Amino acid sequence: MLEYSIIQTRGFANVTEGGRVTGFQLLVRMPNYRGAWGSLIDGADVTVDGVPFSRDVTRWSLRGRTFSLDELRRSTDVHWDLAELATLTVPLDGGLRAGVHDVAVTIYLRSPYIPAFVLPLRFEARRECTLVSSGGQAGFRYGVSLYSFTGDMNTLMTLEDAMADIADLGATGIEILTQSTVLGYPEPTPAWIDEWQRLLETYRLAPTNICSWVDNQMWTDRDLTAAEAAAQLASDVRLAHRLGFGFIRPKFGVVSPELDPHPTWEETVLRTLDLAASLNVVICPEIHSPTPIKHPVTQNYIEFIERTGTEHFKLMIDTGIFQTAVVNDGHPGFDEDEVPPFLQPLKVPMSDLAEALPYVGFIQAKFFEIDETLTDLHIPWDGILRTLRDGGYAGWLSSEYEGRREPYRGREQVRRQHALLRSLASDL
């Protein structure tokens, strides 16, 4: 789906030719109510951070062909469809810095049925766009959880849109949620699985973690037995394997405000471990606020790992546990001016992360708000990345935006996080 804004979130990037950065590009949609022949396109003025770039130097790419403005004006077989994106490429030696930019575009179109004195028609747009650097790996693997796009998925975005966004960041991993993403869960159709595989191949993405639930309290009159809970988990482990995932996060039902899992969690996992090992799927319970690392819940998981010696049960760290400042991210059911105790920042120290790191299999890079200067207002990323690097972690950092749910906001925030993480990682 195209975004409502003429300027699209996706596609804002530097352009490299012959080993050097020669400019930048952005994607724009047709702003008129109908398409137009290329000869009727009268150019586009682009302004970035107050610096203007004339329409005379901007090159247009449509349907795999690239044109100067003069070439468009003389063209006879080029058409810009209403549902088609055009790429505007602006020459600029060295390109733009990574980060957030104020981008404005004015597109000029002629229309033969409108009197000449009115022409060209002007279509103006302005928005903040984030450019993500292609470097800054530092040994980490970057991905995105589709939870980041909650509210936009299936309303403003398709699964393919989400995958295209992830690939556009230069990220290579996708994390999904069983009951949010998988059509026909728990038994998706062969057609859905075929489409899933096609999209993975198209956008060159690797399945990372699949989030599932063990709904221990499914009914009001009784809880699941350990056997029933294990059957749920086993079903999701098989699904994870079918879809290509190496990690699965089971969210067990909880029995306390500190998120103590249902007492049957251990037997549930024990019943499923052999299956997980045979399919090479790692079960990762999530360490999520308000549960810190130095807590009986986390320590019980670690003791289980040590006792069993298994390689198929590890911790998933949600970086929200390192939150240092209060955030009102719009949790439903809570007064905006009152933050309940379980939403208060935990401020888990980096020393705790370093100590737990040998037991960690996956990092959910939770965040709430990154401003236009690429400052995260709540999560201390520099300390987190340094601790992970120093501890030898070379796994996934999977973006999980959990801020306010406004249209398209998650998409822009994820871009900001990747720009921030790459910048910090390049300095490690």
Language model features: what each stretch is:
Residues 201-202, 218-317, 324:
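Active-site acidic/histidine proton-transfer and metal-coordination neighborhood
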Residues 132-245, 277, 310, 314, ...:
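N-terminal pre-domain/capping segments
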Residues 153-157, 185-189, 220-225, 259-263, ...:
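Short, solvent-exposed loop/turn segments at secondary-structure boundaries
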Residues 93-95, 110, 115-118, 173, ...:
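Accessory recognition modules or surfaces
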Residues 148-150, 178-180, 213-216, 252-256, ...:
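Active-site-proximal loop/turn and secondary-structure-junction residues that shape catalytic pockets
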Residues 1-133:
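Terminal leader/tail segments of proteins
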Residues 174, 210, 273-382:
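Acidic/histidine-rich catalytic cores of soluble enzymes
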Residues 396-404:
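Short acidic/histidine-rich active-site segments
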